């Protein structure tokens, strides 16, 4: 395991213990995002937070918002497989201004 990954896990554990579960989870998602969505999608889309039970993903063009809408179930399934638990019920996709 790399030092970077160990540090990320230590920071996540600290944030969870301090009651910042969403921040810790967002960090976990960000660390595996490119592996789950692929480098091309990761170039144009990134997880930015949560709204209710949905993961908020920001994209750089409306076309990517449409594409991610079609891929939502696949992305959520990939995140669940990577992290070992469900992370959100849906995706809320926003276009960066």
Label for each model-derived stretch:
Residues 69, 80:
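A short local structural element in Rossmann-fold oxidoreductases
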Residues 1-34, 43-49, 66, 73, ...:
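N-terminal presequence-like segments and adjacent domain-start helices
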